[in-house]
A protein has these predicted regions:
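Metal-dependent de-N-acetylase/amidase catalytic core
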Residues: 1-20, 104-211
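Solvent-exposed loop/turn segments at secondary-structure junctions
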Residues: 24, 54-55, 98-100, 143-144, ...
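A conserved beta-strand->alpha-helix junction
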Residues: 49-51, 84-102
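A short helix->loop->beta-strand "cap" motif at the edges of active sites that frequently abuts
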Residues: 42-44, 89, 177-180
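Acidic/histidine-rich helix-loop elements
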Residues: 56-74, 100-103, 107-113
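ATP-dependent adenylation/pyrophosphate-handling site
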Residues: 13-71
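Short, surface-exposed alpha-helical segments at coil->helix boundaries
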Residues: 73-77, 81, 154
Length: 211
């Protein structure tokens, strides 16, 4: 297992990475290979899903029958559990409701994006203090793309990291912890798209990236 030594300390701490995402499936499309790499190297990895993805769309027609039978919430719970198993990561839910991608329409009243920070931040502070990651990954201030849950995930992540480091903030949630590094997922860039396109072409699979 990989370990790190804090400045001024001889104590070796296991390396830990926390990946904070908006919905189940985001962990698989944004950083899955990175997480699998570090798990293989002995790093402890935790995925945190802010919502259950209850208002997501079914893009795979083959899955529609199962969604009709069990409901999208149950299907996404099962998919997340399987993804965590495949990646070899720990997983936690924050339990907020998917806001949906309304594209200009008002958000539902129970939307994660509308939850006050005094409600949404403390559960994440608790997880950070319990898991004690040296590194956190999440989205930038634009959410990677303008989904309200992705933007809100950035907001609560940065607020929780700051609060987790403050021994005077939420002392009831455990001893303070300083996250050493924060990285933003940057999946929408040319090198990644080209690599995906070439891989699909090599496997004789129709590529959506032809243009």
């Amino acid at each position: 297992m990989l370990t790190t030594t804090s400045v001024g300390s001889t104590t070796h701490e296991p390396l830990r990475l926390m990946a904070i995402h908006a919905h189940p499936d985001d962990e698989s499309s944004k950083g899955a290979a990175t997480m699998a790499k570090y798990v293989q190297e002995g790093v402890q990895v935790m995925v945190v899903s802010c919502t259950g993805g209850e208002r997501g769309d079914v893009l795979n027609a083959a899955a529609q029958e199962l969604v009709d039978q069990l409901g999208i919430h149950e299907v996404r719970q099962r998919e997340m559990a399987e993804a965590a198993h495949i990646l070899g990561v720990q997983h936690e839910w924050l339990g907020f409701m998917d806001s949906g991608f309304t594209e200009g329409e008002p958000l539902p009243e129970d939307a994660f994006a509308l939850v006050p920070l005094e409600v949404s931040v403390p559960p994440l502070v608790k997880l950070i203090r319990e898991f004690r990651p040296q590194v956190v990954t999440t989205y930038d201030e634009n959410g990677g793309y303008p989904h309200p849950d992705h933007i809100q995930t950035h907001v609560i992540t940065m607020a929780a990291i700051q609060a987790a480091a403050d021994p005077h903030a939420h002392p009831e949630l455990g001893p303070s912890h300083v996250v050493q590094k924060v990285y933003y997922n940057q999946q929408f860039h040319k090198a990644r798209v080209v690599a995906l396109h070439e891989l699909l072409v090599a496997q004789k699979i129709e590529s959506p990236y032809v243009e």
